[in-house]
């Protein structure tokens, strides 16, 4: 990295870490029902919402009621968005007269935005009306993020409380996450983005004639949208001449802010945050990275504050930061080394294919690890154009379970599940009953933490295997061989771990990927969430056990390193064979 890139990277993390304690403390006060600086303005609105919806804010739920409320709410918002997509052509604010989505695409998209995945098998500016983008997708960006935060807060209460079955009230946590955290920060962020050039309007698309016609080759597709291939398996292209260009408009800034803050990731435009109307300047790029990482990192301090030991939160943050920075260093290194095939031709330099020069290599690499280390999935770089090892980095961050720092809420509770596993394994090694935060870790907690950690991974491997033997799934791959496998593996890793980014060479808008992708997103979202709530319910009922001489300190550097090792070992044992057949083989093929 040059001096400029180094300074902007250091500045970003300095600002981020400086905001962790204030925001983490604020969130702890919000969810503990304490008065905050926003209470005079928002408390009346909060009370009004409870009254209108018939919610008793003083009533608390056990883990089963909490989980039922969470699942029921998500079922309702899924059905609402599905209906909206199927009736898009009848709804207002559709100046381009976009038709309704097909039922398979509507199913996949509704599941995607309900589960905080934001996988998009469509191009936003070519398929979704302003009404769909605003009332459907943007609203879901808020409530899906609030759902993740609510579950994380319930899990924190499970560790903090003693001899009780109560984990809080889902409806209260959902409301407070939206009103006090997501809406205010998104409002400020949207205004800053507008100042940088992100558009916000309701104008019709603008058709502009080109000074000189442009001729280019584009992949040829059949009636199902899959790429046409020649007998050798390579894609067939057709030549197109463009005489005018259509410039899309729309209310982008309001969606862009919550897209990043809620680690949602679904772009208003097909190019996502590489589009100049979504991410026009280096400053907007740094702001979007900050928004992506802000809440997941700050929730670790919220955890420490609510359990009464902030060092516990800093320990988890340290593990997240260590893996994230190591991933950034590797990605930056391999991409700056260039494409091996191009280097063999005597052309030296960084691999800038698929990257925007206004962000530079460091700005692109940092965005890539931030968006895949969380469950965001927004991109300012085309991940399919990364070198094989470069592409393996974001893929691996997803396969680890989206926990460095993970999605809003989901990252923290997945990390806590790994912490329980790490404590349990260490207890077995020294012959003592494992304890974490004064709670004994027993069989029930272990089972639930294992389900939390492995549910998404099992779906990735099973569905990727099915795709490799399904003719329709293979036909959707634009690239043969190891890279084609990488595209499929990346797709299911992204969907099952609720990320949403993609290797763009895969034609995802097919019946196979729409339906099985929806299944992966549902299991990847709700199996861990329900399992971790069950674990929290069990922990909340336990008595507090004072630490003794044999208790493993979980707020010290040795435990942080042990937790890091456990995360990497579980990831390696689960996915190394699959990665060996994809990006690793591709890298060896290119360098031999």
UniProtKB/Swiss-Prot annotation:
Coiled coil ranges: none
GO cellular component assignments: plasma membrane
Keywords: Cell inner membrane, Cell membrane, Ion transport, Membrane, Potassium, Potassium transport, Transmembrane, Transmembrane helix, Transport
Protein family per UniProt: Belongs to the KdpA family.
Topology in membrane: Multi-pass membrane protein
InterPro entries per the UniProt record, alphabetical: KdpA
First-listed, main subcellular location of the protein, grouped into a coarse class: membrane
Any GO molecular function: potassium ion binding
Protein name: Potassium-transporting ATPase potassium-binding subunit
PANTHER family named in the record: POTASSIUM-TRANSPORTING ATPASE A CHAIN, POTASSIUM-TRANSPORTING ATPASE POTASSIUM-BINDING SUBUNIT
Entry keyword Transport: yes
Signal is among the record's keywords: no
